[in-house]
């Protein structure tokens, strides 16, 4: 489908409003599904809520990811299927934002919402599903909107070509305050981390080198710094400039 144009200024304004809405904010962007999951967390004195996890979705998604290795047309429907398997359906009519559970004002009233109260380690740690290749870059917070618009345009170009790169899901976008740690990607500046992942279902290889190289080249245009624990090609001469 044709995509609604994104404008850098409006994207940045939405990001700034979103980040200010809770103590911890990240979102998971599924480009092929044209969907975004907003994940917001704040400290609370509420009691823990029971969590419900699907035993069917993880192995089914893994099998679909494996199948998507065999044809360039498959990652998009697999991404949409995975999103449907892991998210509740939107309400038939918009909800009253004052009745939203959890105390956080919803970003939208016509989308699905879920609320969880638990200890921090249980909230922030999650199952990565299967082995994966991953890369992540940290860009200055004020460049977030421009970087996301550029990534979207790049992925559109890739998807339009039969031999273009196909990205798995989701792209994780998270935010960190500036710190004073010399080797930290957030040293001296408020930061947006943008991370890509390519899954290896059943430990089978998957294409990732060219995709990651193009992503790195794009992030360098926004003064990006690599996450040390993930795939990157920045060596000493470049690191000295960061």
Language-model features, listed with the residues they occupy:
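Noncatalytic alpha-helical scaffold of FAD-dependent oxidoreductases
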Residues: 1-242
């Amino acid at each position: 489908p044709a995509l609604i144009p994104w404008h850098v200024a409006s994207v940045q304004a939405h990001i700034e409003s979103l980040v200010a809405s809770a103590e911890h904010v990240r979102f998971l962007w599924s480009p092929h599904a044209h969907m975004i999951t907003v994940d917001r967390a704040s400290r609370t004195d509420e009691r823990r809520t029971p969590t419900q996890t699907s035993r069917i979705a993880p192995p089914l998604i893994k099998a679909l990811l494996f199948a998507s290795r065999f044809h360039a047309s498959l990652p998009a429907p697999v991404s949409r299927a995975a999103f449907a398997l892991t998210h509740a359906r939107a309400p038939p009519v918009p909800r009253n934002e004052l009745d939203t559970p959890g105390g956080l004002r919803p970003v939208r009233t016509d989308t699905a919402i879920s609320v969880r109260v638990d200890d921090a380690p249980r909230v922030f740690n999650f199952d990565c599903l299967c082995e994966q290749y991953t890369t992540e870059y940290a860009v200055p917070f004020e460049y977030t909107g421009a970087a996301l618009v550029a990534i979207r345009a790049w992925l559109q170009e890739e998807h339009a070509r039969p031999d273009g790169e196909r990205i798995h899901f989701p792209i994780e976008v998270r935010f960190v305050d500036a710190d004073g740690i010399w080797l930290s990607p957030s040293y001296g500046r408020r930061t947006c981390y943008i991370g890509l992942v390519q899954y290896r279902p059943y430990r089978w290889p998957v294409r990732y080198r060219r995709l990651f190289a193009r992503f790195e080249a794009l992030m360098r245009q926004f003064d990006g710094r690599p996450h040390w624990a993930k795939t990157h090609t920045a060596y000493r001469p470049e690191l000295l400039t960061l």
